[in-house]
Every structure is written in C-alpha cells, then in structure tokens.
C-alpha cells in the first residue's frame, strides 16, 4: 500500500496473514504474448525467429515446379499502415486489420538432364501485396466486422508418444491390451498394440493393422537385428555328448540348475540340481572362475535361435534366426559339426515373445519385400515398385514437409523414451519407432507404468498465435498447389512473381477462422470480470479437440496436476462441464504451450524469495509445501515436519526435504473464484455457481465497491482494460467528463520528448451484451499521477476497484411466504433511489440499397404517415438525439420503390397532370421493436463515397472534427508552454547579436540581457532568427526550436489525416448507398421477476417490492433493504454468506462510528479510531495532515472496506472481535421489529450488509405478450418465442386438462378459431365487428396438412362430411 498516497487510493483492512511474494501477472498477457510471437511485428525482418508467421512461410516456400526448372523462394514479410483505429472499425462495422506484403524471389534454372546440373538463368525479386491479417487490440480482442471477438485458447493432447492400456475391456478374455501411439502435429499417426494373442502390431493412420516387424524390416533391420535389439541372448556350446551354457551373471540369476554345480577344484556344491541360481551363488561362481555351466537337452525345448546357424563346412544356412529348437534341430547341428550357437533368453521381465511372434507372421525376408508389402497394404489400388514404396515410407515419417513432431513432440519423445535428440529434429527417426516398440513390450512385461492422458504434462494449450498459424499454413498449402500449376502451364521466363501468387485462398482461410471457428467467440462483455475470464478461458472443444458427446468423465474431472494451473471451481454447468475451464490466478503458458505455476524455492528448510515457474512435468516427485505452512521471520519452517504434496498426494515430509513452496493461497483458483470472500467456507457446487454468476452481473448506474472484498478487485479493474490507465508519469492539466489531458515532465531539461497525452473517454457506448459502457474520470485538476495508475473508472468499477453490485442491508427471515423457494423480498427504497438501476443500450441499423427497381431513400417524406409520427425526425429523416421513443415509433424514415403496377388510363392521365405520386414507393422505415422504450443517445450516418451528404451527416462530421481540433490545440499549447519554459532556462541573461523582430515591432533588442518578460509574450516562430553571443547556448536554442517545429508539423499532419478520413466518405458493402445506426438507451429499474444473486451461489428472483414501512426494522428504526430465506443456507452449505454478513455488519457499524466522529469534528478520536481499524497501516494514518485525514476518513462513512483473501481470510474470532469493537452484538444477530405490526420478532435475527448483484436475466427482456402476430406458413399456427413475436403453445397436456374439466366449447375455440382455422378466423372477425357472439368453427389447417401428408404416402384419405 505504501507506494500510493492514502488520499488517492482506497485502503482496505486486510485479514491476510501470508505476505505477498510476487504480484499477480497481467491477467490477459497470454493472449497478447501469443499473438506478438506469431506476428513478430516489431522485429526487423532479418532478425525474426523461425516461429509463427515466419515459420509458416519457411515451411511452404520454396515452391518448385514439377520439372524442377523454377523455384519461388520466400525472402521476408512486412506490415503496411493501419488504416482505421479500433473505435472507427467498431463504429463502421469493419475489421481491425493490417495489410501484409511479402517479398519473394523467382529463380529460373537451366537444367542439364544428362549431367544432372542446375545453373541459375534468371532471378526476379518482387514485393507482393498478400492480403490483410486481423490485429489484436490492447485488450487482447479482435474487431471482426465491427464486433469484438475473443479467440479462446484450446487445451488439447500434446504431440509425442503415449502408452496406454484398455483395462481389459476390449477383449472377451479380459486380457489387458497395451497400446502405444506417436502423435505428430502434422503427419501420420503410428499406433502399436499387443493383441490378445501376444503379437506386436502396427497401424498407420488407423488403417488395417500389420505385424510391427514388417515396418522395422522396411527400415532396413534384419530378423537377427530385431531379435538382438528386443531380447537378451545366451551363448551355448555344443559337444557330441553334452551341452554347455556360457556363464553370464545377468542371464543366469533366477534360472534353475538342471545339473548340480560344484566348485571346480573341490566337491563343494554351489547350487543343487533343481534349485535357483541366487545372487550369492552367481557371485561365488564368478569368483571361482566358472566359465560355463552344463545343461540338459530338455532345457532347450521351446527355446529359439537368436542368430542363424551356418554349416561350418559349406557356409549354407542350416537354420534361420527365430527357429524353434527341438531334438531334430540339435541332432542336425551336431552332425554338421556346429559347436557354438545363440538362443534367446526368456524369463519374466525380458519382454515376452510378441516381437518373435510378429516375425513369424510377417513372411518377408528382405527390405525390398517389406517396402512393397507395406505400400500394397496402405495403397491397395496403386501399382507398387520398390522406389515408389521407399519414397512413400520416407514421406510418411522422415520428411519435414510432410511430418512435423514440433519441438514439443520431440521434447516429450525424448523425456518419455530417455533420448537426447536435439529439439530441432522434428521428424521421426528409425530409433524412435524401435524404442517405442521396446518400451511397449517392456510395459506389457510389467516394467514401468502407462501414461495418464489427463495429466497436464500430456495436455497443452494452443493459444491464438498457434491456432492462426495452423490456419495460415492451410491457406498457404492451398495456394502452393495453384502456384505449381501456374508455373507449369505458362512460359516461366515471361512471368513475374505476382503473376504466380494469388493471396485470396490465404485471406479466405483467415477470414473463415475469425468469423466461424468454434474457438473465435463473440466476447462476453457483460462486465469487466466476464471480459477477463473470457480471455483466460481454455476449451477442450473445437477443431482437433474433443466433442461434448465423446468426452468421458475422466477428461472433465479435476486432476491433481491442475493445482495452481487450472481452476477446480470455475467451469460451466451443463454439457460443457469440465471441458471449458479457466486459468488459475498466477498461471502462465510457457513457450511449449504447457501451463506453469510459480513456486518459492526452498533450500535446506528455508523458503527463499527466488521464484520458479514449473510445468506439471517438471514438478514430478518434488515435495511442495503449502503457502500457509508456518515460517519464522527468516523464512525457515517452524515445525520439523511439513505437510506437502508429492505427485498430488498429501504427505508429511521433513522440513529439510521440502524443495518448493506455494506462492499464495489463491494460486489454486481462477480470477473469478478468488473474488469470492470466504470461499473456503462454501460448498464447491455453490462456489461454482457464485463464480459463474459474477460474470453475469449487470453494470449498475451508480457503482459501489464491495465492503467485504478479497483484495483482488483493483487488479481485475486494472487488467480488464475498461478503466483508463496512465501510460506515463504526469500531471493532470485538463479534465472533464469526456477527456483527460496529462502533461509529462522531461527527464532532461533541454530535450523534447512527447509532452502530452490526451485520453479520450468512452461515453455511453454499447457493449456486446447491450450493457452500457461508460468511463468517468477519477482524477482532479493538478493531480500528479504515476504510470500504471487508474485515472478513469469504467463500467462496474468504482475508485479503480471492481464493483459489480451494491452493499445492501440483508436480514435472514421468512416473511409471509414471499421468500419461498429462494425468492427475494426487496425494499421500495432500492427502486426509488435507483440502487439497482442499470442502463442498457440497443443498436438499430438501417441501410438504403440500390435495388433493381431503383434507389431506396432515407427521408422524412414518408407516404401515409401523419405529422405526429414524424415529430422526432429531423429534415434528413433521422431521429433527433434525446428523443424519447416507444414501440412502433419511427427511428429512421425510409422509402423503397415498388414494382411497376399496371395503371388504368385515368391514373395515367392524373399522373401525367400532377407528376410523380407517392403510390410507387412503400414505407420501409426503421421502427422501434416491441419491448424497447428509451432515449436516443447516439446516431451514426455512413454515406458511400461520392454520395452527397445530408445535413445530419455534416453535423456529425463537424462535431467529430471540432473534438479533433480541441485535442490538437491543447497538445500544441502545452508543447509551446514547455518549449517556452525551457527556452527561458537557456537564454535568461544572455545577449542577442541581432534584434528579433515581428514585422516592425522589436521583440528582443540587440545587446541587452534577455529577461523572462521578453520571452513570455514573444511568439516562438520569430525566435528561430535569434542568435546569441554564446554560440553553445545559441545552438541549444535552435536545436530545441527545430524539434518543436518537427513535433508541431507531426501533430498537424496527424490531425489533417484524421479530418481527411472523416470527410472522404465510407467504405460500405456493395450496393449500399447509406447506412444509419441508432442507439437507444433504456433505464432498467429493479422489478419483480429480476434475478439477483450474492457471491456464494445464493441466487433468487425478486418476488415482491415492499414499502419501506412494512419491512422489518432495527431498534433505531432503520428498515432493512432485503429479506432472504434462512432455509436457503443449511442444505446448500454456502456458509460464506453468513460470515460475509457478519463482517459486513461490523464494517457498516465501524463506518457509522467514523461518520459520527466526522460530524463532531473530533480529529484525535478519529485518528485513533482509524489507527485501531487499519492497524497494519497505522504509521501511514499517523502521518496524515488534518485535511488528508478528513479526506481519507470521508471514504469510509458508508462502511469500512475490508479484504479477506481466499483461503487466508478472517477467522471467526477476528469477526467477533471486530463486531464487539464496532459496538454491536458479537453474535452478529440483532433484534428486529415487524414493520406491519410493530411487534418484535421472536429471537434475534441474522442481519448485516451483503454484496448483492443484479444478473443479466432481466424480466423486461423475457416478458412478452401477443394478441395477433405472424403465423407459420404450413400449419397456419402462431409462431413461438419472443423473437418471432409468437404465442403461447397449447400442447397436448393442456388439451387433456381442458378435457378433464369437460370444457368442450372452450377447447373447440382454442383448437380452431384461436389457432389455425383460417376460414373460422375471418368469420370470427366479421362476427365481432357486427357484434354477434356466435362461434362457427371450420377445419383446422393442421388437419389438412395431416391429410395431405397421408395422401403423399399413397393413402387415399378424404373426410366424410354428414349433411346437416
């Protein structure tokens, strides 16, 4: 708190015990950093890294033609000028984008086919316009076609290798089937599985499986190579009579002795026959120098040859590798004189025989056969040759153009398989595939564990930059095909690069991504918190992700690795639960896309100030202490053992073994959840509702920050982008409701930096959710501000803090059944004082087009409309600002030409005499839709270039230009004043060598010392002629004036550019002549049926608005504002609201005490009280002057603001102490009296101040009535829903109810004339007009539809009518 004066920033009494180690990082930096890395806009072309856009161009270029005679190479890209500002794009319905230009080089070769040499014949380099690319605004959003959108980051499975098993569910035998999968970012997937028969199979791209060894042989490995790679071997010696096994400590241990083994020099038995070779026995044998062990022939049954056996005499192959040994085999080998051979060592833990079985199945011997066989299986229709097949396999896995593991994939592969291949190698290598198979075989043999795919080490975040990079690549690949075709079709020498490149496919893909992708979403702009959380959202849905239907329970569940990375609370209720999540407060995404969280480094039991960001993989096996572990002043753990997390499990660890410590208790939860005070006392389900409902709170007209907050309110307000934040230190030189002007001091006296910043505030603009976006200055004239200070409040912020609702006095009490089922009883005072009044702005748009029948016209001259209806329109036919409008009122008058009708001779004559009549146009004016009643706050007119502007357009233009002129004049004036003050410091007391004149008047005489008065009145332009005796000073003067002149010209130029932009007309869609947008503001007061909620998931609907005098009141006569149902607390288990209400009572009562002291002007008592309340900041309070003390205390008249951080908040005894010091009952309850009877309620009642929000589900938007309206074309029944102006459906259950009551005539009326009996409807109308009350029902249209449908099925159906 000490960094800002108390008078400028509200102080909150904080109950947090844990010291703040590190500030919360900027809440929307993930979006910004990702997009900056993608564009590298501020990096010179030659210094750009191969990431993002640069990487995409490098991966597609160079593009070579089919014959190899020409190549199109990429050199660099650069960005053009931004044409329109963000605000202009929003108003004009345009996209905020920047043009991109690429420099490419076309190289033409002379190819000597015989020698295979290429010589460069020609090089042409050219810069080409390459379409536009949307830019991100400072707030991390995109403006697409005039609406703000957010690209949500996607959480998807990382590339790399994954091992898994099916838990025995796939096969009837219940055998566990193990699988491995190598997933690239781009290219073919490899799946390996060991099937129930224990054979290792491979699938490529989920096609038909084939034995894995087929692929290994295609890579050039022989059967022997594979057996020796996957298995250990044993060497045997064959003599005519006996068999010996070479002594090998590794393989021998654990085997049984088939013959008793004795010491070589004595009869001492080492291992008896039939016993196991133990470690001790093997060691004894090694010491005794035993080199071979005799075995029996039976021991070789079912054993397999590891290498082929050759005939020693002829060199022929007697038996191939992988041959099973039997008696005949041994006899044949003895006969041939074979003395040494090798067998495979098989024992538990040596890999099983799945590879050996696959080798028996693959039926190929050579590499060539294997290649052809795989090609035949994957491409059955194509003719197969060895060369084609080899090229195909190469292309599948080993070519960067077709296969990309990405740096992440390579890193994950290295980590999982224990490799150290450089990260730059982004294709697979043969060893990777082989090692994956070996790991899978070992896994089947119970060595190692399978991967957990829901672990955050195996899921990564694809932020905006990467999502757009993938789209851009798709566009470039489409363009590449077209370029190759053009290169081969036309004569290449005559072509320039721009003849080959057409950027349309790329632009189309980017446009499609931003416009229609599931991840590009309409920004939730209900309030600042909803904006921030929308930008921090992670979605598992979207292209390449999961679908709601397929996602199981595991993916949606909270995982231990989410701790500090993903919020376990904030997720939507409904089908998307767990698939859409939010980043935790301190979390960030690293360059590989993994979510990291910060920890304090702990060394030898001391928590240091060093901070380390770790991903879920990096914190594996590290004991992590919680943030609330008790520490002494030096940072050492107080207790000898510390409760820590290891791999998500809680364990007790010695303090010396702890490696890391959490940074803060709220690093666990998201921004929205950490705005809930006493979150630790709420049930998880209700906390979820609480964090979701805060995002639906409507910004109120009069904002008020919560008395009981969590200390995060300021951070959210600052980072959301709705408040104005000072970019540099400065002083406020001008401030009004629409702009703030800051003047900056220079660091050096004689230098000229930009002197002034003008902040234009947003006034009553419409947000995406139709809420009102309005900024108010919170600085005073002359105030000094620091960079990063909030200088203007936005919607739902107060004094730089988030303020979503209002503090109201709430009692928990049943009241006449009006708070049944969570209903809320509200005081009339809240409506009268506009406590929960909000402003909503609707936008209405009308366009006049050039139609086939002629031009539409926006005009006041509308046929068949009386003067009364036109009273609010100006001469141009557009409603005036400030007009109060109701449903049906005309906002913009518009007429459209009708089709030519055949005129009678009389009409022709009349038309010839009286000229054009209004008969050939129809009224298509924009009218106010039902349910909208308010005031016109803004109108915008956009006219096509070359169309004559009407008066209203000129008026709007003049206002805009006047505002620009004011900004320019202010900037120039401050610049001039600054220059003048700097000049005075340089030339004071100096003498001029020649007089400075303006016309004939002498401004500065020659030879006299220059005074401040001379310069005060002197214009700056003539001073350029000033020459001083001191040359050094003279030079500084001219340097200063030169900089001033340049800056002045730059300001003037920018002003002229903006004016020019306003005057030259607008870019409108084809066929549109003029577009008018009207904004109508509506005041929504709190009314019965509005949904309200607290911050703990305690939601309800307003059931009754009671007069103040009927509500329960305190002993001093103060009535409460709201009555809630006490039964809503116990079963919901959100006790946080009770603690909030108690602390709120204390805060309010302390505020009352401060107010009393202020009124009595008891300054000593006031200072003492303030020091008592803000005990942690007592020294600062003591240092305040009397005036400052009064100013600071004035902020707390309506209650003392407190902060109770999540998981580190106020304890029960602290609340009771505070209640006592505030002079109220420590129980937090009070005696209340019934306002209707004046009698006291039985028992004391829980009452206090609670923060309540009004949610976006307003009754005015939902209520709807219809008498007559549109009917469905086919069934002729009324449409449904408010948007269609529909009726209430009378369904079959309602028909049953009417039947049950026997109301036959009423029912007949419902089903015929009131619904779809067309003839009956007209007859009914006639009867009503004539005053007769006779019902004549006809045939309902829906019955006719049924008859026609049955007839269309070929069933002849007709209705037999009885004669009356």
Curated annotation (Swiss-Prot):
Pfam families: RNA_pol_Rpb2_1, RNA_pol_Rpb2_2, RNA_pol_Rpb2_3, RNA_pol_Rpb2_45, RNA_pol_Rpb2_6, RNA_pol_Rpb2_7. GO terms for biological process: DNA-templated transcription. Disulfide bonds: none annotated. Its EC number is 2.7.7.6. It is an enzyme of class 2 (transferase). Coiled coil: none annotated. Belongs to the RNA polymerase beta chain family. This is DNA-directed RNA polymerase subunit beta. It comes from Desulfatibacillum aliphaticivorans. The lineage of its organism: Bacteria, Pseudomonadati, Thermodesulfobacteriota, Desulfobacteria, Desulfobacterales.
